[in-house]
Structures are given as structure tokens and as C-alpha cells.
């Protein structure tokens, strides 16, 4: 919010469209909905004409409805949280949870990620405390999985013998594209005799774009993920591939404009009836909000061949 406010103070209506959109969303995030509405109207006037104006009016009605909703959930801070980032929890084996954390558990001088000055993310596992429904005894996940760069966003097969997760494009060294960007990739590991094997990247990865945030359908036959690959509608879209009998994958399919916007869709999660995801492109309260859609309403675009 602070830096977007400085930009707007300096440039006002000449502020770039992308920055104007993000500034409006940051205002939502701090509860300044009145000013956010005004800036979103300015954003839409600059972006297009009457059709967008009608959409803006509809969005305001939806937002007003959200603000009038009664709270339905109690939110508790778990004991495994630290002063660093913790996110992307996933149940594992019935009584454990695997999650990503930048928690510094080393006695040595830990390498830090320059973007946020926090240690690199690793996967941790914690046990469920049946009495309190909290989590305890958090430990780092397998040494075969965690590296000196980022690992996060894990998904497990129904039998817990296969896992997918997000990692920097890192083999023996950090790989970059032609513009010098190190992308994210999805990796897969299988468990043999109770031990996780060295992970291998999935076939639809590329050195030229990112894939991440894997999520498996309950039967393990579809893998949903996030990417900015060619054919994306926005900054990051949600895609799906079929997991075939031999372990290979179909070509990625975009979930389409009912789900994906020109902005960011991220962190998909699937149960038997609904897809849940985060977005800053749909109408919400600011930043990334959580949305849901019933499977019956999904209209998935044709396959995209990235070979």
C-alpha cells in the first residue's frame, strides 16, 4: 500500500494501469473500500468503455453484498506458525500435515532470499494434536525433497505413495531463461520402502515459463496447477492435466475465462464437489481472496500442446 500510495500521489491519473489496479486492491486490503471503488472506476474508464462500466456496477453490488455478510468461521493461529512465512498446508497420512515454511531451523548462518530477506522455503511435516486440533512436533520433510532453494505447495496421491510439489528450476545449478529469470517447476517423487526417492520434474515443465501449486483430484486422475505458459489468459492461470495409467500426462488444458482472469489465479484445491482457488481478478475484498466453483460449472478450454 505505502509504495503504491507514493506512486499515485506523484502521478495520479497518469499512473500505469497495472499499478493503478494493484493500488486499488491494496486499499481494499486495508479496508478503504470507498477510495478503492473510485480508483477501480478510473481503472475501468482507462481500460475500456461502456461494457466495462456495466461490469463495474455489477462488481460494486457484489462487493456490497460481501461486506454485509455475517462471519461464518472462527480463525485460530496455529502453534506451528513462526515469524516467517507459512502456507499451503496439505493433510498427509491422516494424522499429519505437510506445509511450506521459511522458518530458520539451522544453527548456522542461513541463506536468505533477496526478494523478502527470509530464509528459503522448505517443506515441513507436523502431527495433529487430537485433543486441541492444533499441530505439534514440526520437523523438516525428507532430505531427498528439500534443497537449498524453494520447495512449497505439495500434493499427495490417494495412497500417499506419490507426491507433487513446487521447486525452483534447479538441477545441479540454478537455471534461467533467456531473460535471466529463474522459473518454478513441478516435481514428482515416489515413495519406495518408506523413503521418498529423488524428485523428477514433470513433462509439461519448461525453462521458459513457470508451473507450480499442484493439486490432485480425490481419485488422483487429474492434476491441477498454476502457470503463466503460452495460452494463459492472465498473469497466472489454473490448468489441468490427466494423470495417465503409465504415469505420463495429457497436454495441459486451461480452465477458461469463467475461472481465469487477466490477473492472478493461484493455489487450487479440489474435493469431490468443488474447486477452490485464490484470485485477485474476481470481485473480492482486496488482494488474493478465496473463491469456489462447482465442477458442474467448469468449462475447460481445449488442450494446449507445449512441446
Predicted regions and their residues:
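Alpha-helical solenoid repeat scaffolds, predominantly canonical TPR units
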Residues: 3-4, 39
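Canonical positions in the second alpha-helix
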Residues: 6-8, 43
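Structural marker of alpha-solenoid helical repeat scaffolds
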Residues: 10-12, 46
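Residues that mark the junctions of alpha-helical repeat units in TPR/alpha-solenoid scaffolds
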Residues: 15-16
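Short, conserved micro-motifs composed of acidic
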Residues: 19, 29, 33-35, 39-307
